[in-house]
Amino acid sequence: MELVIGRVVKAHGITGEVVVEIRTDEPDRRFTPGASLRAKRSRDGGTGRNYVIEGVREHGARLLVRLAGVNDRDTADGLRGSLFVIDSADLPPIEEPDTYYDHQLEGLRVRTTAGQDVGVVAEVLHTGAGELLAVKCDSGEVLVPFVGAIVTSVSLDDRILEIDPPDGLLDLGS
């Protein structure tokens, strides 16, 4: 499974740098000189092309990245909208208990401790107050806080996430 770690926003300057919106918790690990990244055009869904990073510098909340073979503004601008992706198999295993990568939770069936089917985790949202699971259900979408008091168990093998929702939480999607 491919995971997006960055998106090319635009070209920067005339020497071929690109502005990259960071979409990873580990930008220092992913965007380092000498590292190879695969860039895919978001609209054509092809296999993409590999690039070697020649240089990286911070630019506010974004990065300015120089890629081998991208030496002018026109070439850099041609990458606008491209997504930098990695294979989920390349991620290190998580050592901490009850900690998951977003892609591991997305697609899990959600049910209550009473056995009621709720829906499927569509997305993990990261907010200032913590993580929320966007659960797609028949009546729409319900946001479930990803906290131990509500999420009682996660079984990646069985693809099931069990919750003990407080009264009214599941009514919000109706």
Swiss-Prot record:
It is found in: Cytoplasm. This is Ribosome maturation factor RimM. It comes from Mycobacterium ulcerans (strain Agy99). Pfam families: PRC_RimM, RimM. Belongs to the RimM family. The PRC barrel domain binds ribosomal protein uS19. Keywords: Chaperone, Cytoplasm, Ribosome biogenesis, rRNA processing. The keyword Translocase does not apply. InterPro entries: PRC_barrel-like_sf, PRC_RimM, RimM, RimM_N, RimM_N_sf, Transl_B-barrel_sf. An accessory protein needed during the final step in the assembly of 30S ribosomal subunit, possibly for assembly of the head region. Essential for efficient processing of 16S rRNA. May be needed both before and after RbfA during the maturation of 16S rRNA. It has affinity for free ribosomal 30S subunits but not for 70S ribosomes. Binds ribosomal protein uS19. One of its GO terms (biological process) is rRNA processing. One of its GO terms (cellular component) is cytoplasm. It comes from the Bacteria. GO terms for molecular function: ribosome binding. Its main location: cytoplasm. Residues 97-169 form the PRC barrel domain. SUPFAM superfamilies: PRC-barrel domain, Translation proteins. The keyword Phosphoprotein does not apply. Gene3D superfamilies: PRC-barrel domain (2.30.30.240), RimM (2.40.30.60).
